[in-house]
């Protein structure tokens, strides 16, 4: 738009003598004023966002000395006064916008290039023409106010402390792309903490990235009706609650407790082994449950060989029965729950006075094979010293001790699952072939680091020097093995039970040297136990290899035991079981094995009579 020409003093008479309609000026008619207003409105609506210093430049141009002074004329018309009042209102509006923009915005001052990009249409000066404002002028001004309604509302709204707050730190007026110049006092982002006074159009995006409409009643609720805090004091308290660590929680996925917490609840209160449910008033494993039950039913009395402070855990819980029973009582196991007499056929329950009726009503899940075998080991192991023999004794007492060990070993093996399914004839052959090796394993487990004494299943403690000469070699070799036995493998009940079972099945060779009548059944039992041990040692293949190697090493005790029996046989009446053992074939289990000569010492070398398939193919 061309800049309005400045009127000279020569036109003063013309203005004074002519009507406003006859004045030859760009502002002399109502249409010219409306055209300029229309241009201004179109620029605001269609052009790029207004720069920050736009109103400052407009105010600077309007404050320059004009070519027409409204005050120079004495009797001015009402139209001139109306024009002067309108211009003054617009100037006041521009000044207010500039002041509020300077107070709120902290963006850097626009560069020289941005200043030079101001459209030329806005570099004009206000006209000093004197004319009468028609009624359409007021309508045009009202139209401008309606177009700039969001901006004007900031000054027409009642006082509110929220709108006097500082603008958001990321507010940038140059980044606005609305159809109008927004209120500088409002933040440029949509926040539930600031009331939004702009109508939401159909082209705007909702909180979920989908198009929302102002007519939609099921979309995002209006921030004016939100329950969130809408004032700075409330907002500070609202945000402060998120900064308090006490208000924050760290639950696991889907509200499920962590695995560590679940494992801690499934530990036996007596020996820290795996426990599934409550037994007799406390969470205990199956082994401690059976031990406590047998102790109460048989009214057993135990004595401690130490100072009554023996450690009770899953490795050494069978070492001292006295301390184990005392710990059962300490953790809350109740003797009254154990079934006696006529109660043996139904679940034992406490009376209403004890209020512990849920002790044994919870059924236990089925246990795996090695767990059942480990339970049999614990049920048939005695770790309590009953008598001590430090004086030398003869061969008859030695045979009585060995005979008692044989019956205890047979009872233990018959209590193990799978092994008890073997036919009696084959069971007797395998027991005779593995008896001395199994006795050495159990002695090593009972003796520990003892160097001068040995304890048997009967609870009798003997000095090494008290044994007859024919048993000295095998007994001392047992004690030597016991010194390092506990440190070779982590002997929990499952691994220890599998070790004994594999030692019992050592005579089952590929060529059936022992002459088993139902070898396929024995092969099936042996394969089942090996697979169970493989699964049990899945996290430590080294442990599996150690157990297999120890099975070969302990097989040498069979030859040592035969040497002692061969010495006693001519002069002593041997029990029937020992006679069966002596008459058992002594053919080597493998072609590389040779039977030892009678009376010759046998060194505990790595070679053995055990024909067990080593390597990955066996597992």
Swiss-Prot record:
Pfam families: Hormone_recep, zf-C4. GO terms for biological process: cellular response to corticotropin-releasing hormone stimulus; positive regulation of transcription by RNA polymerase II; regulation of ovulation; regulation of transcription by RNA polymerase II; spermathecum morphogenesis. Residues 346-356 have a biased composition (Basic residues). The keyword Metal-binding applies. A zinc finger (NR C4-type) spans 268-288, 304-328. Keywords: DNA-binding, Metal-binding, Nucleus, Receptor, Transcription, Transcription regulation, Zinc, Zinc-finger. Residues 1-18, 125-134 have a biased composition (Polar residues). Disruption phenotype: Reduced brood size, abnormal egg morphology and arrested egg development. Defects in ovulation with fragmentation of the proximal oocyte and endomitosis. Misplacement of ovulated oocytes into the gonad arms due to a lack of spermatheca-uterine valve formation. Degeneration of gonad tissue. Decreased spermatheca organ size due to decreased spermatheca cell number. Disorganized actin microfilaments in the spermatheca, lack of distal constriction and defects in spermathecal cell differentiation. Residues 1-29, 58-86, 103-134, 196-232, 345-365 are annotated as: Disordered. GO terms for molecular function: DNA-binding transcription factor activity; DNA-binding transcription factor activity, RNA polymerase II-specific; nuclear glucocorticoid receptor binding; RNA polymerase II cis-regulatory region sequence-specific DNA binding; sequence-specific DNA binding; zinc ion binding. Transcriptional activator that induces gene expression by binding to the NGFI-B response element (NBRE) 5'-AAAGGTCA-3'. Required for proper morphogenesis of the spermatheca and the spermatheca-uterine valve formation. Promotes cell proliferation and differentiation of the spermatheca precursor cells during spermatheca development in larval stage L4. Might play a role in promoting G1/S phase progression in the spermatheca precursor cell lineage. Also required for the differentiation of the spermatheca-uterine junction core (sujc) cells which are generating the spermatheca-uterine valve. Belongs to the nuclear hormone receptor family. NR4 subfamily. The NR LBD domain and the nuclear receptor DNA binding domain are sufficient for binding to the NGFI-B response element (NBRE) 5'-AAAGGTCA-3'. This is Nuclear hormone receptor family member nhr-6. It comes from Caenorhabditis elegans. The gene is nhr-6.
